[in-house]
């Protein structure tokens, strides 16, 4: 089978907290070992078991803001008093080498990432089947206190209001189905004509 070289896909998955974006993104990474993960920069403290450079790049707020000011971050935001951002260099290097990447970020990150990489981003928004189900899922998280859940529910409504900015939308009422749908989005993105290098030369050779 002929495989032409192509530019990588930047798959962005966004959703309100509890809708399943991280679970879906992790399932894609587990099923496709070649799928690259962007290691974000954050100003929050490491949680037990988290490793620098594997889960996050942990930086203080001054360094984080310097990176943002110097253009070293493709996108960044301060959420709940914590800074999160995507380093520019490793992403651009991976895409140019033909490696696909998946990001689980919020709508603001998606907007900034699309502005920075307009030809590379393919985006997917994950909706919960209902707000009641979303609240139930958040309540199952033992680490979140009632005040935190209330704050996340308020933030969820804001996140959901931006669903129409995304290329694709799925409803996560069944996780296996949602993962399969996300994989279909990635497969279609890989086949985009604009992403396949040397395709023009290959087709031109048919008439020789």
UniProtKB/Swiss-Prot annotation:
It is found in: Cytoplasm. It comes from the Bacteria. One of its GO terms (molecular function) is ATP binding. It catalyses: GMP + ATP = GDP + ADP. Pfam families: Guanylate_kin (PF00625). Residues 8-187 form the Guanylate kinase-like domain. ATP binds at residues 15-22. One of its GO terms (cellular component) is cytosol. Keywords: ATP-binding, Cytoplasm, Kinase, Nucleotide-binding, Transferase. Its EC number is 2.7.4.8. Its main location: cytoplasm. PROSITE patterns: GUANYLATE_KINASE_1, GUANYLATE_KINASE_2. It is an enzyme of class 2 (transferase). Belongs to the guanylate kinase family. Essential for recycling GMP and indirectly, cGMP. This is Guanylate kinase. The lineage of its organism: Bacteria, Pseudomonadati, Pseudomonadota, Alphaproteobacteria, Acetobacterales.
